[in-house]
């Protein structure tokens, strides 16, 4: 990839449908802890459901999350997580293909897909972002790799351009 990230942690809030994919350098409890803490942002977690992997169990314990685990080796017992993973994978591939970017950009595309999906209104007229944060997303919803024209804010001329002028 573009970074040292070799793994990913996908998380889904079943109540709000909010999801995210965190590229991780390793499958360590520390990396999992940071991702889980960022995702929950201090919100109450009524149940943390996982596949029971050691790093997730350790991180959930450190965060004082009530835990439950699926049966090991039986993905059909964890259909919500498996479907979330499939959705993020398909959405990430679509963004990469649409942008014409190589697979190495997955570390940018996966989180970008999640933000775009999280801010899209559902059948009830509200987005998962709204159900989580109590207000709709205020930022621009731009797909990964789209062409943009950037206009920097006005700044004081420091004369640096004259320093580098070759004429």
Protein language model regions, located:
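Charged alpha-helix within mobile-element recombinases
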Residues: 80-141
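Retroviral integrase
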Residues: 1-88, 132-167
């Amino acid at each position: 990839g573009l970074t040292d990230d070799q793994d990913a942690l996908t998380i889904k809030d079943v109540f709000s449908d909010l999801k995210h994919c965190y590229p991780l350098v390793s499958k360590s409890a520390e990396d999992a802890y940071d991702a889980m803490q960022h995702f929950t942002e201090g919100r109450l977690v009524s149940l943390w459901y996982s596949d029971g992997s050691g790093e997730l169990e350790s991180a959930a314990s450190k965060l004082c999350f009530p835990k439950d685990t699926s049966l090991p080796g039986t993905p059909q017992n964890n259909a919500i997580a498996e479907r979330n993973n499939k959705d993020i994978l398909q959405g990430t591939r679509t963004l990469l293909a649409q942008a014409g970017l190589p697979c190495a950009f997955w570390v940018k595309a996966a989180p970008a897909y999640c933000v775009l999906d999280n801010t899209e209104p559902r059948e009830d007229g509200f987005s998962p972002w709204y159900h989580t944060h109590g207000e709709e997303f205020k930022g621009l919803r731009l797909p990964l790799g789209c062409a943009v024209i950037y206009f920097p804010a006005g700044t004081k001329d420091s004369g640096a351009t004259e320093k580098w002028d070759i004429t």
